[in-house]
């Protein structure tokens, strides 16, 4: 509770008697306008904004003269709300079916403080639930309210010095909301475990529909002066589930709820909240006296516009309390997984089923934010909000010995992180509600949204998600400097760093197979997406900030592989915008060579810091190159970046990058200088490396390439192949040979260009095998081989045509053999590459799989399925039996030489995980194998969506 000084208490009493005393509201006000339906008209909206006089007519004279649309306003005082509530309660009291006689209590008309007399020898469990009498109506107080710790705190914290003569020493006033209405026969009940002493026990979730009962709590938060975006620990508390069934009932009148009921006292300060890792209550000492009347949180409509708005939101025309949330009123139910599943047919990738388009897709972004907000409160018990997630993560024990370390997050960092993320989350909710077409367009509608509350998991869980982020992403992207992630050092109270940390948590949560982790991940992705655009719009210099662009990189990666149609579309669309920011910031251009100063401690430190800034930007550029390559590969689009623009230096060695001290870095630099490298801190750019690759200067093996450099070399090769493939699709199926005597631009010419690209891929394969033989267990290099085989598949197949065939589109009645040739140009090479994709991904550790691994399985599966289905259709139309394997069988997922042959009479087969083979002459078995492979791998929303698509494909072709 809150300590109120004598001066403030006198001022509060004077304010209450002037504006909220029911007796004062009975007398007519001189000069007031005529009352309309119990409402007192005041100045219209236009006049009030212009601060001019208004005759309070409809329309008023000023609006008529100026041709404005006049919007009438009415006074909404607490006394009028109480009068309407009392009138409605009196009408309902006539139909009361039962009346119980228990200890009488006193009900004040303005503030219904329930006074319960307690004998010294009487315990809380022996107190009879009071009955409120008002005009013949009766309502029982739920006994569960007297058992809750909040009630115990009110009884234990009474100060005997503040009692006056009107209240005995053992009489306690409960400022509880009492709805003067008979109980409904269908009144809901809930059993809530409120034993806060045993914090480690699993809570029993109430059986009440969460959002139906939580909407009034959000509305209370929006009108609480102590609650705001910057205050992460609200003084309000979700009482909808703690007050028992009689107070969680939607018919309960909370219009007169006292603010003191929503305060926590010092008796709860020793509890170890999930939101307070230090074990100290974040609510502090909030004790106050009960001898003075508390100001209603709904009052003072003339001092806060939110009071008018809250009344508009919480009460219907009859004055009854309405617990339906704004989202439900506006037709915006909380999004569930079914909404995300409905949008899977509109994905920009994996389009093997009949597509739908954006206009027919449900909106999921607002639902993700609301689900995160709902989960944060755990149906009214915030200390247990992420209890299930903590229990699930406690059983996981990952070995991160070979990865960057994560410094434990202290309580101060977590508190600040949650405070700023609360503001981000509220901003995101406001934007989505403002853009809702079904939203209330009245002047009061813009402020009627319930205030959100975002409660992050404990520091231990956040640390686990940081480790999950390191494990799932930093193996493929060089994002972590100095060999560790220190969230306490990263946090600088600037928005870009907070957004980056939240996206790290979202990435780590997305890699965990847990429903709670997915809720947290999807909510944070949408929150950070809007916040990132906000900070760049407000400060254009942030478009060149490495931290903001690194956060944009994480969002593009998370959104593209999220499995949510809207996030995938936005990530693909904003990829070009953020890449343009990189260009305009000058990060793609070459920088002057860095000459390290190794003499003196200060010189070494300055050189290290300067190099670290330049190296961070260079690694950010080439991380964007890898993301650009992945998104273009799996979405069948051109890469955004051009190799001729990539003049920034390639990343330096990992030994330099992971040096945690100046001494380690200086020793590593000295080691490279002693080996004859004159510029160890300024490697060549990707442009220069690719030029040497084209000139075959890298074939002799004198230049040792790292796994990351080989990965980057695939980007320009893939871009060249995309250009040739687009040109190839413009030709018809009819073969037109080149005319002798001059070079013509024909399909044969383009096919020769494709063969040139295949020769470059073969040259890259030789370099990669040399690197892989030196380190066979390198996860990065094995992932590079998967990308290589997928790019090679694009050189011998037409994947968009294969998906069109799966959707049974574009069939012009031509022969099936010609369509097979239109989908797969080189069957032998295609079958080999698909088998290698299966083999490599199956042998990778589950926790080291790349995020897009299920999409790679999908592409290989679709090519093998199309090959089998097209051959079956061709044989069926020709009335021929399938050929027998006369020349043996080909294990397509076994290691093979790059140059191989596969006869059409040979039936390829795949070896399952148990060692048993199955042949690929039946396209249904190909789909079954892929579905089982996805089930055995790391779980993700993307993988589950692809599995559903493959099942639907099998049903369509059954």
UniProtKB/Swiss-Prot annotation:
**Metal-binding: is it a keyword of this entry?**
yes
> Which Pfam families does its entry note?
Fungal_trans (PF04082), Zn_clus (PF00172)
Q: InterPro entries recorded for this chain?
A: Transcription_factor_dom_fun (IPR007219), Zn2-C6_fun-type_DNA-bd_sf (IPR036864), Zn2Cys6_DnaBD (IPR001138)
SMART domains according to UniProt: GAL4 (SM00066)
Q: Which UniProt keywords apply?
A: DNA-binding, Melanin biosynthesis, Metal-binding, Nucleus, Transcription, Transcription regulation, Zinc
Q: Which GO terms describe its biological process?
A: DNA-templated transcription; melanin biosynthetic process
Region annotation (Disordered) maps to 272-301
UniProt lists compositionally biased (Low complexity) regions at: 287-301
Q: What happens when the gene is disrupted?
A: Leads to the accumulation of a large amount of shunt product scytalone.
Portion annotated as DNA-binding: 44-70
Where would you find this protein in the cell?
Nucleus
Cellular-component GO terms for this entry: nucleus
Q: Give the chief site where it resides.
A: nucleus
Instruction: Name the domain of life.
Output: Eukaryota
Q: What induces it?
A: Expression is positively regulazed by the cluster-specific transcription factor pfmaF.
Extract the GO molecular function terms from the UniProt entry: DNA binding; DNA-binding transcription factor activity, RNA polymerase II-specific; zinc ion binding
Its biological purpose:
Transcription factor; part of the gene cluster that mediates the biosynthesis of dihydroxynaphthalene (DHN)-melanin, a bluish-green pigment forming a dark layer in the conidial wall that protects the conidia from UV radiations. The 2 transcription factors present in the cluster, PfmaF and PfmaH, coordinately regulate DHN-melanin production. PfmaH acts as a pathway specific regulator to mediate the expression of Pfma cluster genes including PfmaJ, leading to DHN-melanin production in conidia, and regulates the conidial formation.
Record-given protein name: Transcription factor PfmaH
Q: Which organism is it from?
A: Pestalotiopsis fici (strain W106-1 / CGMCC3.15140)
Provide the taxonomic classification: Eukaryota, Fungi, Dikarya, Ascomycota, Pezizomycotina
């Amino acid at each position: 509770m809150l300590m109120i000084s004598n001066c403030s208490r006198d001022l509060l009493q004077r304010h209450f008697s002037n504006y909220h005393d029911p007796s004062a509201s009975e007398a007519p006000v001189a000069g007031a306008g005529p009352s309309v339906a119990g409402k007192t008209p005041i100045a219209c909206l236009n006049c009030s904004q212009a601060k001019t006089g208004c005759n309070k007519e409809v329309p008023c004279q000023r609006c008529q003269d100026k041709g404005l649309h006049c919007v009438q306003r009415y006074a909404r005082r607490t006394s009028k709300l109480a009068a309407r509530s009392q009138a409605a309660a009196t009408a309902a009291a006539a139909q009361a079916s039962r009346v119980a006689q228990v200890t009488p209590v006193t009900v004040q008309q303005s503030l219904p403080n329930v006074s319960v007399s307690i004998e010294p020898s009487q315990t809380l469990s022996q107190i009879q639930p009071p009955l409120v009498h008002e005009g013949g109506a009766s309502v029982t107080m739920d006994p569960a309210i007297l058992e809750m710790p909040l009630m115990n705190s009110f009884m234990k914290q009474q100060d005997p010095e503040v009692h006056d003569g009107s209240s005995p020493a053992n009489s306690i006033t409960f400022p509880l909301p009492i709805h003067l209405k008979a109980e409904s026969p269908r009144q809901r009940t809930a059993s809530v475990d409120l034993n806060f002493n045993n914090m480690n026990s699993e809570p029993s979730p109430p059986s009440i529909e969460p959002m139906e009962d939580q909407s009034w709590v959000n509305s209370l938060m929006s009108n609480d002066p102590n609650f705001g975006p910057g205050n992460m620990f609200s003084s309000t508390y979700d009482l909808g589930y703690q007050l028992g069934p009689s107070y969680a009932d939607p018919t309960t009148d909370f219009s007169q709820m006292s603010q003191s009921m929503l305060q926590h006292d010092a008796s709860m300060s020793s509890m170890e909240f999930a939101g307070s890792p230090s074990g100290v209550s974040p609510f502090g000492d909030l004790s106050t006296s009960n001898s003075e009347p508390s100001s209603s949180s709904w009052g003072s409509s003339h001092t806060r516009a939110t009071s008018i708005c809250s009344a508009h939101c919480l009460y219907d025309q009859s004055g009854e309390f309405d617990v339906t949330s704004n989202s439900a009123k506006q037709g915006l139910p909380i999004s569930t997984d079914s909404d995300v599943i409905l949008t899977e047919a509109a994905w920009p990738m994996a389009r093997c089923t009949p597509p739908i388009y954006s206009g027919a897709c449900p909106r999921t972004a607002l639902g993700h934010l609301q689900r995160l907000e709902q989960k944060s409160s755990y149906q009214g018990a915030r200390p247990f909000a992420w209890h299930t997630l903590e229990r699930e993560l406690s059983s996981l024990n990952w070995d991160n010995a070979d990865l960057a370390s994560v410094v434990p997050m202290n309580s101060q960092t977590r508190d600040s992180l949650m405070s700023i993320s609360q503001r981000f989350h509220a901003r995101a909710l406001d934007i989505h509600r403002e853009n809702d077409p079904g939203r209330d367009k009245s002047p009061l509608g813009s402020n009627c949204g319930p205030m959100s509350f975002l409660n992050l998991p404990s520091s231990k869980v956040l640390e686990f998600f940081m480790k999950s982020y390191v494990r799932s992403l930093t193996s493929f992207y060089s994002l972590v400097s100095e060999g560790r992630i220190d969230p306490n050092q990263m946090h600088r109270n600037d928005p870009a760093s907070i957004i980056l940390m939240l996206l790290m948590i979202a990435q780590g949560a997305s890699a965990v197979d847990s429903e709670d982790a997915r809720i947290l991940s999807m909510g944070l992705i949408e929150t950070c997406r809007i916040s990132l655009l906000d900070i760049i719009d407000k400060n254009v210099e942030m478009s060149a900030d490495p931290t903001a662009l690194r956060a944009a990189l994480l969002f593009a990666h998370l959104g593209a592989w999220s499995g949510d149609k809207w996030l995938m579309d936005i990530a693909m669309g904003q990829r070009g915008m953020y890449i343009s920011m990189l260009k305009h910031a000058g990060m793609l251009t070459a920088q002057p060579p860095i000459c390290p100063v190794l003499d003196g401690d200060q010189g070494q430190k300055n050189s290290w810091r300067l190099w670290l800034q330049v190296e961070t930007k260079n690694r950010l550029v080439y991380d964007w190159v890898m993301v650009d390559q992945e998104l273009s590969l799996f979405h069948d689009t051109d890469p955004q970046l051009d190799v001729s623009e990539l003049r920034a230096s390639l990343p330096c060695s990992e030994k330099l990058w992971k040096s945690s001290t100046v001494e380690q870095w200086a020793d590593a630099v000295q080691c490279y200088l002693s080996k004859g490298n004159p510029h160890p801190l300024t490697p060549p750019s990707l442009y220069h490396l690719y030029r040497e690759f084209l000139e075959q200067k890298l074939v002799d093996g004198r230049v040792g390439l790292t796994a990351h450099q080989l990965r980057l070399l695939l980007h320009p090769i893939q871009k060249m192949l995309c250009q040739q493939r687009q040109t190839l699709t413009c030709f018809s199926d009819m073969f037109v040979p080149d005319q002798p005597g001059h070079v013509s631009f024909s399909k044969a010419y383009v096919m020769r260009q494709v063969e040139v690209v295949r020769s470059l891929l073969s040259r890259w394969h030789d370099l990669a095998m040399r690197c892989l033989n030196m380190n066979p267990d390198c996860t990065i290099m094995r992932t590079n081989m998967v990308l290589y085989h997928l790019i090679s598949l694009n050189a011998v197949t037409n994947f968009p045509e294969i998906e069109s065939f799966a959707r049974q589109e574009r069939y012009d009645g031509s022969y099936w053999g010609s369509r097979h040739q239109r989908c797969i140009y080189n069957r032998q090479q295609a079958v080999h590459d698909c088998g290698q994709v299966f083999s490599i991904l199956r042998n990778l550790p589950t926790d080291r799989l790349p995020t897009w691994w299920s999409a790679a399985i999908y592409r290989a599966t679709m090519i093998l399925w199309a090959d089998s289905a097209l051959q079956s259709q061709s044989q069926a139309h020709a009335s021929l039996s399938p050929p027998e394997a006369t020349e043996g069988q080909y294990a397509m997922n076994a290691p093979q030489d790059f140059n191989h042959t596969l006869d059409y009479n040979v039936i390829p087969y795949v070896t399952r995980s148990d060692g048993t083979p199955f042949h690929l002459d039946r396209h249904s078995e190909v789909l079954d194998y892929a579905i089982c492979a996805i089930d055995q791998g790391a779980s993700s929303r993307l993988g589950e969506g692809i599995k559903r698509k493959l099942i639907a494909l099998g049903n369509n072709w059954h």
